[in-house]
């Protein structure tokens, strides 16, 4: 059986790519990418010439079975996202789950992710925190935010820069955002 490698990619700085990640990408039989246009820039930068195949939220349910079959046949496949670690608010969870269910080794490399540097540099308590990922854009957004009202741990959200002000306003309306609870934005 092959191995599925989950390979983090730089979040804004190419120097954050590890030597191990470069080696895995060069040795893989195939590289799955959230956006092949974005990922081709990364691969070109590190002189990686492997086959690049789109694997994103719009096709992952349809392509995962075929990928699992390739892994069962012994191929080594690497999964990358546009930035950060695949599966963390990015495509990858479904494929990793299906591969693990099939008994395939899923190996995640350590590396870049946006949330950890953000919380560590925020000055907020980071000994215990909850990661909420992207807030729903429309359906259930207010209910979702209200469900977090009693959460006392530091919370991490991913949000579009175009919705940050709106989100902060919504958080203040349901008292998640108070003067005693700072809101660093990273």
Tell what function each PLM region has.
Residues 1-58:
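Glycine-rich, flexible N-terminal cofactor/catalytic loop recognition
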Residues 140-173, 177:
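ATP/pyrophosphate-binding catalytic subdomain of soluble kinases
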Residues 94-151:
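Class I SAM-dependent methyltransferase SAM-binding "motif I" and its flanking Rossmann-like core
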Residues 59-67:
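Glycine-rich, highly charged phosphate/nucleotide-binding loops
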Residues 11-13, 82-86, 161-163, 181:
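Short glycine-rich anion-binding loops that position phosphate/pyrophosphate groups of nucleotides
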């Amino acid at each position: 059986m092959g191995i599925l490698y989950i390979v983090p990619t730089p979040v804004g700085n190419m120097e954050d790519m590890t030597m191990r990640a470069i080696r895995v990408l060069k040795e893989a039989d195939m590289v799955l990418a959230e956006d092949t246009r974005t990922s081709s820039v990364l691969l070109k930068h590190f002189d990686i010439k492997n086959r690049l195949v789109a694997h994103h939220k719009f096709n992952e349910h349809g392509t995962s079975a075929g990928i699992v079959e390739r892994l069962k046949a012994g191929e080594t496949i690497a999964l990358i996202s546009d930035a950060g670690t695949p599966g963390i608010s990015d495509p990858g969870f479904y494929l990793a789950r299906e591969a693990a269910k099939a008994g395939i080794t899923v190996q995640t490399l350590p590396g870049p992710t946006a949330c950890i540097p953000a919380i560590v540099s925020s000055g907020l308590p980071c000994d215990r925190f909850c990661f909420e990922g992207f807030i729903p854009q429309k359906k259930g957004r207010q209910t979702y935010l209200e469900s977090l009202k009693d959460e006392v741990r530091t919370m991490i959200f991913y949000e579009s820069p175009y919705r940050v002000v709106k989100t902060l306003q919504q958080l203040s309306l349901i008292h998640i955002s108070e003067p005693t609870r700072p809101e660093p934005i990273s």
